[in-house]
Amino acid sequence: MSKILFALFSLFTLVACGDTADKPTPHPQQAAPQLALSYQGKVYASGSTIDIAAIEHNFGDDTNFMEVKAGDESSPIVVFNPEAKGESSTLSSPLRYTATVTATDFSRFLWCGIEPQCKPLSQTTEIRHGELSAGKQNSPLLLECSFAPQQYTTVTATLHLQATSEKLPAVYTLRYVYAKP
């Protein structure tokens, strides 16, 4: 009798609780961020890593007259994300956002985009506020990274773009690469 009760109890538990071992738990689909980053004609999804090559500018025959920068001539651009669900492809009202840059080697960076003034980064994390609208559908990031001539290295910065109405930002890793030719 106890074996029958145990079997019935086991069957009841299986039916009542369900067997979820093989079934994935459904998660609500997260909407695509309203903002994205475009670089050299390609729009990148949140989570992407973007490589930005450094360019040597020679002002003479000597390395003493050389400047090496990345991000000054060819800069990523903040754009309205074409993948954003529930949004039209054009901006009918202004889209305000926050751009946050984090860089451990912050002294190498000069930030000239999003807001009108150029300023060197003075701390590990810097924040700027911008706006996209029907009349201004993109905004150059203009985050420049300087290198010492012939000191080949890669410097990384993280960019968070978050529209005012969003809970989660779009996140990008920007790798500024000064490679030996």
Regions found by a protein language model. Name each.
Residues 15-16:
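C-terminal motif of bacterial Sec signal peptides marking the signal peptidase cleavage site
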Residues 153-165:
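A short beta-strand micro-motif common to beta-rich folds, especially ectodomain repeats
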Residues 170-180:
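C-terminal edge beta-strand
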Residues 87-137:
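Surface-exposed binding patches on compact interaction domains or structured appendages
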Residues 27-88:
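Beta-sheet-dominated interaction scaffolds and their linkers
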Residues 137-150:
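Short, hydrophobic beta-strand segments
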Residues 2-8:
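Sec-dependent signal peptide recognition
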Residues 82-92, 150, 164:
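Short solvent-exposed strand-capping/beta-turn motif centered on an Asx-Ser/Thr pair
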